[in-house]
Amino acid sequence: MMKIYRACIMLSGESAAGKYPVEAVRTMAEIAEYTERHNDYESNFRNTKFHGKDNLDKISHAVCSMALDVDAKAVVVCSVSGKTAMLVSRFRTPVDIVGMTTDPKIWRRLSMSWGVTPVLAEEYPNMEVMMYFAKKQAQEALNLEKGSNVIITGGPVSRGGGNTNTIKIETV
């Protein structure tokens, strides 16, 4: 069973040098797609005991819990380092995640995180402006309908990475 929560799958031997590389890739894709379709991510999240390591871990868990509680259609993570977006991603909630960052390197890294739509954003002068554009980016990136709830999380823009301390519920 493929329930180990990985964002990526890699085939090395058979796909690179084996006799049946196309079949190997096709089979792995079918298994992964089947597993994704038949996994109840919300139940898994709600029924798993959570033990947070630090405040960032706890905030990431709270974001996911809040997204489910308010029936949010998206979570937007404003992240300099990408760490918060990756932590939110690991909880596998059935809510789309937009990972906003100003760093092209982090933007590329977020594309490998489960359920994350990475968005390369400009730097914003303050948190209020960042939150405004976060909601707008989610609406554009995910084609959200008017009235949809969005959870936005981030931290002070002047401090750099690792300072996520805010969670906000917005309505598109």
Predicted regions and their residues:
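Conserved, mostly hydrophobic/aromatic
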Residues: M1, V88, V150
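Glycine-rich phosphate-binding active-site loops on the catalytic face of alpha/beta enzymes
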Residues: M2-P21
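Generic secondary-structure signature for well-ordered alpha-helical cores
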Residues: K3, A7-C8, A29-Y41, L68-A72, ...
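C-terminal helical cap(s) of enzyme catalytic domains, especially alpha/beta-barrels
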Residues: S15-R37, I167-I169
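Short, solvent-exposed amphipathic alpha-helical segments in soluble enzyme
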Residues: R26-A29, L87-V95, M112-V116, Q137, ...
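Long, charged amphipathic helices and adjacent flexible linkers at domain junctions
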Residues: T27-C64
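Nucleotide-binding motor/catalytic cores of P-loop/tubulin-like NTPases across gene-expression machines
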Residues: T84-M86, R92-V129
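C-terminal binding/interaction regions
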Residues: M131, K136-T153, V157, T164-E170
